[in-house]
Structures are given as C-alpha cells and as structure tokens.
Swiss-Prot record:
Quaternary structure annotation from Swiss-Prot or TrEMBL: Part of the 30S ribosomal subunit. Contacts proteins S5 and S12.
UniProt xrefs under Pfam families: Ribosomal_S8
Gene behind the chain: rpsH
GO biological process: translation
Species in which this protein is naturally found: Mycoplasma mobile (strain ATCC 43663 / 163K / NCTC 11711)
GO CC, any one term: ribonucleoprotein complex
NCBIfam families membership: PRK00136.1 (NF001109)
Function: One of the primary rRNA binding proteins, it binds directly to 16S rRNA central domain where it helps coordinate assembly of the platform of the 30S subunit.
Matching InterPro entries: Ribosomal_uS8 (IPR000630), Ribosomal_uS8_CS (IPR047863), Ribosomal_uS8_sf (IPR035987)
Lineage: Bacteria, Bacillati, Mycoplasmatota, Mycoplasmoidales, Metamycoplasmataceae
Keywords, comma-separated and alphabetical: Ribonucleoprotein, Ribosomal protein, RNA-binding, rRNA-binding
Protein family (similarity comment): Belongs to the universal ribosomal protein uS8 family.
Name recorded for this polypeptide: Small ribosomal subunit protein uS8
Length: 133
C-alpha cells in the first residue's frame, strides 16, 4: 500500500533527518527533478557525500549517501519553510542568513534552485524552500 505524500520536499528532508539520527549510511527517496536539484545543492555545500538515481523509468529513487564527521552527522538540522499551503517568498534584499552564514537557505528562483549566497550573487529573490545547518 502506498501513501499519498502532500509535500514531497518535506518528506525528503524528514527522511534525511531521520536517517542521520539513526546513523544510516544511505537513505532512499522517491525521485523528482526538484528533489534532485535540491540534493545537488546540498552535496555542493558539503552536507551529504553523494547521491545517485536508481531504478527504471517508472519507479526511480534517489539513493543519498550521508556524510559524517567523527561519527556525527554533518547535517545538524533541517527546516521546511515554504509549504504547499503557505508559500514563502523573499526579495533579494530580504533573503535570510541561516545561523549567521553557518547554514544555507535553499531558494527556488527564476534562475533555478540556488543557495541564499548564490541568489544574492545573481541578484534574484524567490521561494524559500528550506534551511539546512
């Protein structure tokens, strides 16, 4: 029996958070292009080791390899900001700084999915997807 996921991005973040709490090496997440782009940012920022697309064209999954330092997860927290029922947008001037720059905000912009630093550099605002620290 499959379950209906109303917020796939939040589901992905919770799966990662739960897997790091249990010190799992990998976590499987149902595939979507947006999740793949978000994971690419998380990887580039050094919060996960790697991820790969697995499965056939009908049932694809993202296999995320989590990153640990001295047996402690590199990801200490995640927070979903913009939700399906309440979208949160920000102009470039009002983009948040997560933990004074120690974390990242993931922003969905007209130029693609970017970190808060990249969005400031590109001078674009957008939908604040999540915070990771």
């Amino acid at each position: 029996m499959s379950r209906v996921i109303t917020d796939p991005i939040a589901d992905m973040l919770v799966r990662i958070k739960n897997a790091t709490a249990r010190k799992h090496k990998n976590v499987l997440i149902p595939f979507s292009n947006k999740k793949s782009k978000i994971l690419e940012i998380i990887k580039d920022q050094g919060y996960i080791f790697d991820f790969a697309i697995e499965g056939d064209s009908v049932k694809k999954n993202l296999n995320v390899t989590l990153k640990y330092k001295n047996n402690i997860s590199v990801i200490t927290g995640v927070k979903r900001i913009s939700k399906p029922g309440l979208k949160v947008y920000s102009s470039v001037e009002d983009l948040p700084m997560v933990l004074n720059g120690y974390g990242i905000a993931i922003i969905s912009t007209s130029k693609g999915v970017l970190t808060d630093k990249q969005a400031r550099k590109e001078n674009v605002g957008g939908e604040i997807v999540a915070y990771i620290w």
